[in-house]
């Protein structure tokens, strides 16, 4: 027994029987179709909208290839249409869709209800904890999974599942810089009218309409994005979450540059300063000397001295020059942390010392 969307005939019973929808010519016109109108509304960005369509088409065309990308739909309020989209996709992937109510569902034993699926969605999922976040990343891209049933030894099976999660919690997922697995979508904070919902569900409850959608995606040109291979698009929402999860030992330099400019600080003392900063600002202080050292050396390569232990020598940097260095290393983060507009270009000009500002003892 197997679940093989490639449908290779090797005399083994295949639990995958293909789509329930017959192949036919689709007459869907995207511009005035009720499903695509809502998908566009929820995507809230033309680039996200195009990626979303390619993502769906990828599963329809090549169900034997995972997308390796989970889509997270966030809105501050409910009723914007997030779950309506997942309901439609459950119908599109009829017989091969599943639902999780808690993030722990993907890690617990006796998980047969989540096997042999192409599409799985979760409501109000919270994966902000690092342990949960790391496990979720594995699930999104894993090619195999263990099937466990009570009283029966677990067996390894192929995993073709793809995920969408919906949430009203802005910080539901822990995002790290360089993440390749999550498409973070900030939906509009505008609830749909009751009549819009009624019309949408009337549409998707008609199997003929879903069949039309299936065939539309079956022939859709999804070559703009090589789903599962290309790096997932970076949205402003995802960038914001990544910045908010910037380690304390990096944030402290951008927040308080004046404390370090003009100083020569040993790596051990700088680590202690990072731990203190993290605790004072309710950030994670669970980082090792190795992690801290690797990242900080990368940030200040030209200022690392290794005489009698590692030191960071900023004595030739004024606060202005220190800020300028930080800006050059990560312009977007510098603007974010200083609440500056994305198109703002700072000028780093040393403030002239006025005669009256000179300390008479230094004159």
Language-model-detected regions and their locations in the chain:
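Conserved catalytic/switch belt of AAA+ P-loop NTPases
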Residues: 133-155
